[in-house]
Amino acid sequence: MSGHSKWATTKHKKAVIDARRGKLFAKLIKTVEVAAKTGGGDPAGNPTLADAIAKAKSQSVPNDNIERAVKRGSGELAGGVNYEDITYEAYGPGGVAILVECLTDNRNRAASDVRVAITRNGGTVADPGSVSYLFNRKGVVLIEKTAGLTEDDVLLAVLDAGAEEVNDVGEAFEVVSEATDLHAVRVAATDAGLAVTSADISWLPSVSVSLEAEPAAKVLKLIEAVEDLDDVQNVWFNADISDDVMELVGS
């Protein structure tokens, strides 16, 4: 998962100071609203909502905004939107497989915007099922590497909660579990005093494509263009990008 994980942790670091933080806030608020609409407005009885709120708070989304989103989703406040969850599949430069997750109130707009962003950046939209089989739906918790913390320490804290593996991804430890165990793993890590920096349902690649600097730069440009769309919540891809190549791309 090296390339994808490095990119994920890089995005996480940048998110707090990103000039487009308002767009990030909007995506997080949308996730909270949909979670409340789907499973009710009480996070104690709705783990998906609890995780969405925790993620929003970790990115400094104001509490008032979060509370209003919960109330809109649960029907306590007017103005809630009926969002549709849609996943698009694509191939990018270098044969990289891409999954695009959207939450949209306009399927036609989302499809058009995603297609344009992909094709303008050297990719092609693929038929349903032609890409998704290369990924597994998992829970992924990122834990900050504090002084003295080891992979074994992390594994010991989260194993009984359903963790399958712990990976060292640079400045964080990545805990992988079944998607249904995400909430339990996050809670176990937090209860053990570990610094959880994110907890998400993710599509992790079962097969990766190794990229050199030029195709890597093209793929990351495509990913950023797609992520910038209002209807897009997440983008997953199976590029394996080494540290050296990431440094070249970022220079």
Curated annotation (Swiss-Prot):
A GO cellular-component term linked to this record: cytosol
Compartmental location: Cytoplasm
GO molecular function: DNA binding
Record-level GO BP terms: regulation of DNA-templated transcription
UniProt main location, coarse: cytoplasm
Keywords: Cytoplasm, DNA-binding, Transcription, Transcription regulation
Gene3D superfamilies per record: 1.10.10.200, 3.30.70.980
Xref: NCBIfam families: PRK00110.1, PRK12378.1, YebC/PmpR family DNA-binding transcriptional regulator
Family affiliation: Belongs to the TACO1 family.
Protein name stated in the entry: Probable transcriptional regulatory protein Francci3_1368
Organism: Frankia casuarinae (strain DSM 45818 / CECT 9043 / HFP020203 / CcI3)
